[in-house]
Amino acid sequence: MPEGILEQKKGGAKNVQMKRNRKRRTLSAVKKKRKTQRNIRLGFLILGIVLVVMLIIKINNPGFFFNKYYEVDTKAVDASKPDIDVELLTPNPYSRSQEKTDKITGIVIHYTANPGATAIGNRNYFEGLKDSHETKASSNFVVGLNGEIVQCIPTWEVAYASNDRNYDTVSIECCHPDATGKFNDATYRSMVQLTAWLCLKFNLTEEDVIRHYDVTGKICPKYFVENEGAWDQFRKDVKSAMAMDKNPE
């Protein structure tokens, strides 16, 4: 075969192979592009689903992603609020430091341990610590013998009541008529109502209601420590009150 014709055939075969290679590269590039586009679409889909889930969680539990103070603001919370006599303490290092709390994760029940004392009397004791410097002590609320509720510290400020749980709990001091520490009916009713309202306010359940005893082992509140059945009933009553507040007839 003449050398010129052979060279032409070789050149033609080479051109065909080059075209095939270009076609393969083109197809490969197209496949990669399509795969990349699919991955991008899948990524956006997953991101969208995550954002929707996060939005749902945030609507139902606004503080889920943060460790900052927040309150639930609904008609049910407003309607369930008990009568509260707001008598805030004077800012001072011994009973009202004005330190901000973290996200509220619990309600702590205390008893005053001074039989017959009144709610305002206990509030005034906390107020007096700014002058006596006797100790550091306070409570967000005090429930009195007639069912009155006195607020001493805003719920977004730390009260000196529950040791290492001061920063993530709201404290309730409760008055009692005698040394048994048992609460009378008026005090008990207000305790249940106040605790239920606070649970709704901070998106908590009755399981988040604890005793001072559960934090430190201190016999406080005495009657609820010595009578577990009474404590269990209190939390059940709080649960019932919350259900009524959420679904009023």
What role is predicted for each listed range?
Residues P2-S162:
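N-terminal catalytic cores of peptidoglycan-degrading enzymes
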Residues V108, V142, S171-E173, I210:
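Soluble periplasmic/extracytoplasmic beta-strand elements of cell-envelope proteins
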Residues P2, K33, I40-G48, L55-P82, ...:
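Basic/polar, cationic surfaces and motifs that engage anionic cell-wall
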Residues N163-S171:
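Short coil-to-beta-strand
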Residues D102, E134, R165, T180-Y188:
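Solvent-exposed, acidic/flexible segments
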Residues T112, C175-P177:
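Short strand-loop junctions, especially beta-strand C-caps/beta-turns
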Residues S97, L129, C152-V158, N163, ...:
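Surface-exposed loop/turn and secondary-structure junction residues enriched for glycine/proline
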